[in-house]
């Protein structure tokens, strides 16, 4: 209970601070501008940026326009039949077993433009897995974890220069899977997905920086996220797992501006650290840390201005102390705006 209060207060304070900055009186020109000007936003929205699905493994860097809503159904799966050892190595060097893991993790993500600079979101999920480990088989289907998300964009890209957009990302993970008595999958993670990966069934507070630059016909996005893993409890004792770092680097090549058809090359990494931000020694989980490096080719296109689709498959290319897996995935966006016209983020 203390942990959830702490995280809830942290998220509330961040939202309150950034909303106050939005509503405050204009800041003198010689001071630092906490948000882009109306002229900068207008210039950006008139530049090349065709409506399309966008990245699969990353939330859009630029925020929703005020009053615009998106709801996304995301189906992410995992097929893992070999494992990496204690040294970082390529997928070709992974060894069969000892865990064979098959997972499907559907989620529904919603995001809404509170202002032209702040976007609020939430994500709920389910998780099913089938696994064999050392001859023992397990399977489970249940609720996944719930994420509360806020994005704040203090800098918007300038089409006339090299300046990119810069967005601050905050995510609070609530362990609804644990509250619903869902069983943890081997390794303690659901499949790598659109949101920064966190440990299944545990509180987590993620802070991240995201950036994007459009260079017709290419869009380039990158991000880094740090997740603080809250202390857990087992048999009346506190447990401490390592914090987690996620990174993304994504290239989108839009081939048809009208249909939003294009292909993506997306690089995703997940690192389990051997330390914690609070300084506690690690006494649970993978104490030696782990690394997963993957590359995903994907296709994206629009059925209409309201329905946007992407399909891809993430392939693990290297890893350490982790399962060597492939991750087929499908993503569908439904977009809505009170004015009837969808604006690309």
Region spans (language model):
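Hydrophobic, lipid-facing positions within transmembrane beta-strands of outer-membrane proteins
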Residues: 54-56, 67-69, 104-108, 144-150, ...
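Residue-level signature of outer-membrane beta-barrel architecture
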Residues: 62-64, 112, 124, 152-154, ...
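Outer membrane beta-barrel transmembrane domains
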Residues: 82-94, 238-345
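Transmembrane beta-barrel strands of outer-membrane/channel proteins
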Residues: 73-77, 122-126, 166-174, 222-228, ...
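Short loop/turn motifs that connect adjacent beta-strands in outer-membrane beta-barrel proteins
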Residues: 32, 59-68, 117, 156-166, ...
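Outer-membrane pore/translocation modules
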Residues: 125-241, 287
């Amino acid at each position: 209970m203390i942990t959830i209060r702490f995280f809830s207060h942290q998220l509330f304070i961040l939202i309150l601070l950034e909303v106050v900055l939005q509503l405050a009186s204009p800041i003198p020109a010689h001071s630092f501008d906490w948000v882009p000007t109306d002229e900068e936003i207008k210039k950006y929205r008139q530049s090349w940026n065709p409506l399309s699905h966008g990245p699969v493994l990353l939330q859009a860097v630029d925020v929703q326009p005020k009053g615009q809503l998106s709801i996304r159904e995301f189906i992410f799966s995992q097929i893992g039949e070999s494992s990496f050892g204690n040294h970082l190595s390529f997928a070709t060097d992974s060894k069969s077993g000892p865990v064979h893991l098959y997972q499907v993790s559907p989620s529904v993500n919603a995001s809404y433009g509170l202002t032209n600079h702040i976007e609020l979101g939430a994500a709920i999920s389910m998780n099913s897995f089938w696994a064999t480990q050392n001859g023992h088989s397990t399977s489970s289907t249940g609720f996944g974890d719930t994420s509360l998300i806020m994005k704040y964009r203090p800098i918007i890209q300038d089409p006339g220069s090299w300046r990119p957009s810069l967005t601050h990302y905050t995510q609070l993970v609530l362990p609804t899977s644990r509250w619903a008595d869902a069983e943890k999958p081997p390794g303690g993670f659901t499949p790598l997905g659109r949101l920064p990966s966190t440990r299944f069934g545990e509180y987590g507070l993620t802070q991240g920086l995201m950036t994007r630059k459009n260079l017709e016909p290419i869009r380039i996005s990158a991000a880094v996220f740090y997740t603080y893993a809250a202390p857990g409890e087992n048999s009346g004792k506190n447990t401490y797992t390592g914090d987690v770092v996620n990174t993304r680097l994504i290239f989108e090549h839009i081939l048809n501006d009208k249909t939003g058809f294009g292909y993506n090359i997306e690089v995703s990494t997940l690192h389990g650290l051997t330390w914690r931000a609070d300084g506690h020694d690690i006494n649970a989980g993978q104490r030696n840390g782990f690394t997963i490096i993957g590359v995903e080719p994907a296709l994206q296109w629009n059925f209409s201005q309201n329905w946007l689709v992407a399909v891809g498959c993430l392939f693990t290319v290297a890893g350490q102390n982790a399962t060597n897996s492939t991750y087929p995935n499908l993503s569908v966006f439904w977009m809505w705006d009170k004015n009837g016209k969808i604006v690309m983020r």
